[in-house]
Swiss-Prot record:
This is Transmembrane protein 231. The gene is TMEM231. It comes from Gallus gallus. Belongs to the TMEM231 family. PANTHER family: CHST5 PROTEIN (PTHR14605), TRANSMEMBRANE PROTEIN 231 (PTHR14605:SF1). The keyword Glycoprotein applies. It is found in: Cell projection, Cilium membrane.
Amino acid sequence: MAGVELFSHPALHTRYRAGLCSAAALALLLIAVLTYVPPLLVAYRSHGFWLKQSAYREQPTVRFRYELLFVATTGPGPGSFLAWSTFPAFNRLQEDRLRVPLLSTREEDKNQDGKMDQLHFKLELPLQPTEHVVGVQLILIFSYQLYRMSTFVMQSMAFLQFFSPVPGSQLYANGDLKLNQRQLLNHCGLDTRYNVSVVNGTSPFASDYDLKNIIAAYRDRNVTTVFSDSNPIWMTGRGANTPFIVNATIRYPVEVILYQPGFWETIKFAWIQYVSILLIFLWVFGRIKMFVFQNQVFATTPVSPVLPLSPVLSYKQHQP
């Protein structure tokens, strides 16, 4: 029997054969192209075919590093401030403007999942009766880590700043340490590019402790943390012998992390879109193929199966 089998269908009980260079074979090739290529074009042109970014939720592992830099403004003049930090080189530069505060900190794991959920921070700055605080600038340094996809480790900061024309007795802040991304994280591997100190605590130069320079260098990072408290509370009415107090609660919330998907995740996402469109084309062109071969639009050789005789009929035929 000449040719090769081009098409068969259980409902037709017939196989159709023709040569490889016949019109029927070329028609079958065209139908195959029209079945599989257009779904790919439709999925691609509908946008979102290739997954360029993805997201997941994770609570970061955050710990306070017990490193800070504190500046209290006491007047309008350029040298009217008191300062202290955990960096000895910075403290040596302050001379008579150095004032050592009393600190108390406590990190709390509220849901007992092994990760800290918030930091309670309190700073008490002793003041002379003639000294008044009209502004506060505070940098707190944290260790910030993500583990679910890639392992991302960095040193980050919370920056708290407030000024008032009225001298205060206490500044109260309560907010979240929010992750800020300008770049997607990797889907796997170890990323420690920002695991460096926010403040160069060993430098003897005053410019390295200038808050403007510290903030500018920190903002150059593609991944940072920002302390979000749009409504800090400034309290007034400090007693003559009472310290100025900074009282802050910094929460470590669950974050939505944006990352660059890996190869297999991208393929899986594209495959789902392609197959969902392909099923429609398979159904349509399957009916077209059945019509073409059943109605002999192109010349083929139908081959019908030879059904076996029934055992009863076979027995009767052999009876004498």
